[in-house]
A protein has these predicted regions:
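Short loop/turn motifs at secondary-structure junctions and domain boundaries
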Residues: 1-6
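Cytosolic beta-strand hydrophobic patch enriched in CBS
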Residues: 9-15
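Conserved acyl-donor/pantetheine-binding loop and adjacent beta-alpha core of acyl/acetyltransferases
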Residues: 20-25, 29-64, 70, 119-127
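Conserved acetyl-CoA-binding loop-helix of GNAT-fold acetyltransferases
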Residues: 65, 71-84
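Conserved GNAT acetyl-CoA-binding A-motif
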Residues: 79, 85-99
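C-terminal "cap" of GNAT-fold acetyltransferases
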Residues: 99-100, 109, 119-137
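A secondary-structure capping/hinge motif
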Residues: 113-115
């Protein structure tokens, strides 16, 4: 994904306080692709060629935080940043899928739960498709 659409990978890194000249540590990240298709599907995870740089929708595939940094707001800050970039880019909005226990988290960030995803069973899990609409046509 990084090679296919590097402008759609957002990372939070930090210096090691014990080794400030050493390598940075990844503490949180978000990635996804853009498309004119309105719904997130499993096919998008494996087919980077589906990325449309000027696509109407910012799909969010992964939101991750290092276990020892959870609860600090890093994931929320990155998702808000992605939404702001989508807004500035003139996209219609952002779409993600969330496990049931995370629906409330994304709802607090402005995403609306559209129910169980019909297009994604990634990893054999139940996913809720969630959408944050920025522009309506």
């Amino acid at each position: 994904r990084l090679a296919a659409y590097p402008d759609h990978v957002w990372l939070a890194v930090e210096d090691d306080p014990d080794d400030p000249d050493g390598p940075e540590r990844l503490v949180a990240g978000v990635n996804g692709m853009c498309t004119d298709l309105p719904d997130l599907t499993d096919e998008m995870f494996s087919r980077a060629e589906l990325h449309e740089p000027d696509g109407a929708w910012q799909m969010i595939f992964s939101v991750m935080t290092a276990p020892d940094r959870r609860g600090e707001g890093l994931a929320a800050a990155l998702v808000k940043h992605v939404v702001q970039e989508a807004r500035v880019s003139g996209r219609r909005g952002a779409v993600l899928t969330a496990k049931p226990e995370l629906v409330g988290f994304y709802a607090r960030l402005g995403f609306r739960d559209e129910g169980v995803s019909q297009g994604s069973t990634h990893g054999g899990a139940v996913w809720h498709q969630m959408r944050l609409t920025l522009l309506t046509l």
